């Protein structure tokens, strides 16, 4: 895997990650040491397929969606285990929704660091979807820091 990222993009990613204000020793180490492999994963998470057909967020978004749904299911099971399965499923769909992910992405200004191709840049109809999908990919990248042996 090519882990080369130009210096300007590297600094943009680091500045963005610092803005998240994550207080984790491992996270701070990665940022301070400019761990190229991990930062490449963040670059991938923040790149739309219209900009790069090979290095983009699609795989991370796919796994991110699964991890979020599993985490939400686990939380709901532990917290609201007396609810019917149908009600728990409805609650999960509210917790892990494109609307929530878009709101999260907007709150952290993720759109400022997403690399998009010209077609996606001009497509206002897919703007929120891209923000939601990128947020999922970012979440998985953050999880990858704490569990780097995972296959994603």
Question: Model segments located where?
Answer:
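Acidic, Mg2+-coordinating catalytic module of metal-dependent nucleases/exonucleases
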Residues: 129-143
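Extended, intrinsically disordered, low-complexity regulatory regions
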Residues: 1-55, 104, 108-110
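Alpha-helical ds-nucleic-acid-binding substructure associated with the helix-hairpin-helix region
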Residues: 90, 97-116
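Histidine/acidic-rich helix-loop-helix segments that form or flank divalent-metal centers
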Residues: 110-131
């Amino acid at each position: 895997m090519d882990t080369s990222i130009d210096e300007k993009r590297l600094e943009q990613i680091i500045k963005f990650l610092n803005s998240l204000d994550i207080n984790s020793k491992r996270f701070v180490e990665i940022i301070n040491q400019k761990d190229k492999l991990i930062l490449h994963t963040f670059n991938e998470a923040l790149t739309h397929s219209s900009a790069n057909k090979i290095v983009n967020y699609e795989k991370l978004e796919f796994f991110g969606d699964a991890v979020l749904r599993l985490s939400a299911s686990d939380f709901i099971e532990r917290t609201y285990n007396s609810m019917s399965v149908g009600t728990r499923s409805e609650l999960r769909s509210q917790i892990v929704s494109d609307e929530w992910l878009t709101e999260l992405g907007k709150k952290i200004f993720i759109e400022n660091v997403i690399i998009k191709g010209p077609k996606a840049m001009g497509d206002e109809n897919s703007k929120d979807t891209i923000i939601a999908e990128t947020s999922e990919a970012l979440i998985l990248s953050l999880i990858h820091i704490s569990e780097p042996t995972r296959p994603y």
